[in-house]
Amino acid sequence: MRKFLLTVCCLGMFGSAFGQSKLDLKSLMELNKLRNTSIPTYNARTRSLEQPKTIPTNIMAMVELKDQNNRADLEAQGIKVLRVRDNIAIALIPLADVERIANLKCVRRMQLPRRLYQKMNLVRKEVGVDKIHQGTDLPQAYTGKGVVTAVVDGGVDPNHINFFKEDGTSRFAYVGKIVENKRNNNGYQYDKYYPRTVLDTMTQANNAHALETFKTDDDESVHGTHTLGIMAGGYKGNITYGEAVGTYQAKSVTGANPFYGSATESELIASCGDLNDSYIALGIDDAIEYAKTSGPSPKPCVINLSLGSNIGVHDSTSVMNKYLSKQGKEAIICVAAGNEGEKPIALKKTFATAGETVKTFLTPTDISPVDEGGTTYYNFRNGQIAAYSKDSTVFEFYINVVDIKQDNRTILSIAVPNNLNGRDVTYASKAKYVNNSNDVNKDFAKAFEGYVSVSSAIDSETNRYYAFAEVMTGDNQTTNQDEDYKLTLEIKSKKAGQSVEVYTDDQNIYFDDNDEDGFVKGSTNGSISDMACATNIITVGSYNVRNRIASLDGSIYNFNGLSTGESFPIGEISSFSSFGTLGDGRNLPHVCAPGAAVISSVNTYAVKNKDLDYEDDQLQGKLKKGKDTYYWHQSIGTSMATPVVAGGVALWLEANPSLTVKDVLRIIQQTARKDNFVTSTGDPVQWGAGKFDAYEGLKQVLKEKQTNGINGVRTTESKDAPIITKAGDRTFNLFLASAKQLNVRVFTPSGQLVHSLSAQGNEYNLNASSWNKGVYLIQVNGNKAQRIIIY
């Protein structure tokens, strides 16, 4: 199941506090939210608004320095620097001092935390992992030995049996938990949990605890346990699971667990807790550092990020995306494309003339009521909107209140202020939503409960003009009970040929024409997560491999309830899979993998949480072992597809630890399958290179390693020497990189020719099943013969 989390940031900036700021508009609005406890914030888990209780002393921020040597300048200001990667630092900033630090000469830009959202048996067979585990036509089997596999996620249960070795000990190196803690002077709490055998050997153990005592970071989420299980879960013992016995019925059977993952013998790391980009970057850094320093030589590392946010410029230039790009040079990082592929949350327009407009309705995604104290919000609109010009040319940007019964007449227009410094304009229904009571507007209150805020600036990195809006409204149930008043977005060009890109975060808003003339729908091209637009990462979309779920209650379900019809057609692109054509010309995702539906291990503490109401109809596997019970459950999303790729890549890294992200991406694109579904369903951009093929990719890795060696050291005499590898009991793979045709001759040691053949291409599978036992010499295209032995 997909779970979409919502957020809301407060508005109403302190007008006198900001000059030309190096903080982006989202950070400015987030700063005001952190400083104000009167404005309710949205809790997506409970679908209710809550009142903040405390103001943090410090906040973790990402600071882009003008030079990597500026760390000392930052520390001279009393700032605690936690990490530096090239010229980007993760630092603790006093909340009262954010603007001053941002405007230091040594600082280029600063970004405050952005909340990110969590976005197998059939799967292993589909992508060829079963063949890899069995060593089919390979020199050996691969299971991820010697590779570090990590997730940054929430809902992690590291003591699930899926993450134990056969001897019952943990495969985890450590689990890191980072959470906001306003009572802590740092503003956060970072604890690490190690297996007790490791903890007992540590001389310094500040904030270090025994892994065996860890339960979970979040008993309302199964997400992180599920994604890690897909990537690297290794339990293969018996469990009880649902098995179909007809169209509608299932039975419970006991047998070998069919739902284990790909990198079953890899070393595990999880970073969990609160999911904002500063914490996520810190968790990634620590996983990379562990992989580099925990052994006699650096270990290859794969990191799965089934997280994202749609708000942002959708290129590689944000501080977070630049930091992620730098991290991608030291680990293979796989990022989910997003689950908004069906949502029109992007809008792109090139204006033919100056003064031309584009208008769209801001439509709520979910119309069910949301409560806070004594206030109920109906037709709840909650989210952020960002609009970007192609260059520094400004455009007019309005959030309008219109009356649909009066031919969409605008009764109130909220326009960006005539400044470029981030100072906002806010309209609110009540004083509790704002710092300045002058922002309360009776016409706005007639239509809505809540507030709208808009601002604009020039992006200091790209020199692009952009406008930003925060929206949190519910329909006034006295004067807008009939829903006659609506919110719209309007953009007006300043010159012919001007282009704009507009994105909303899809937390509770999408762009729609409302079947009204003069308004436009949004586009699904552009639904890609902003974080997935970084360079030096692998971005993953989803396709369907399972649409009927055999559950432990004896029934078979699809995603419309009991299995009575087709949903998520097998082999086709998952309709929810996000995608986008970026302004820099890139199409994302890079590739798709099975994401609907995938069965994997889930957080025991979430299943046992009575508020979540997990029953056997939602569970596909169960194991009771002593006093503990472990569970397996289906879920869908690019969150599930991404660890399929990450786990497959871990197997490649076992075969060749020297692979870079460029190598991995190239091999993914070369070996991806392009079947009829890829060419006939979904948007071509949505598919990327096609369907991820771990098996064919591994074969390519082995070929390139044998041909080119590791770090440039060749394992054969020349690039044109043939590569002969054992592919089975009496089969051999012959490969000659430069050949268009293979001419193969087989001799006895005495020089007698016993076999000869020709084959088109540079690869051939030689079947020697009928040959007598003995030693043979194989010559390919006249090269030096190589010896094989038939047993």
Task: Please name every model-derived segment.
Residues 48-51, 248, 294, 300-309, ...:
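C-terminal subdomain of the subtilisin-like protease fold in secreted/lumenal serine endopeptidases
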Residues 4-6, 17-139, 148:
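Autoinhibitory N-terminal propeptides
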Residues 28-55, 97, 118-168, 205-222, ...:
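N-terminal domain-start motif of subtilase-like serine proteases
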Residues 273-351, 369, 374, 379-395, ...:
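Substrate-binding/access-modulating region of protease and related hydrolase catalytic domains
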Residues 713-791:
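C-terminal outer-membrane/trafficking sorting elements
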Residues 136-279, 298-299, 328, 341-345, ...:
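Subtilisin-like serine protease catalytic core
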Residues 156-229, 237-249, 261, 405-509, ...:
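Active-site core segment of subtilase-fold serine proteases
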Residues 228, 236, 269-274, 285-302, ...:
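Hydrolase catalytic cores
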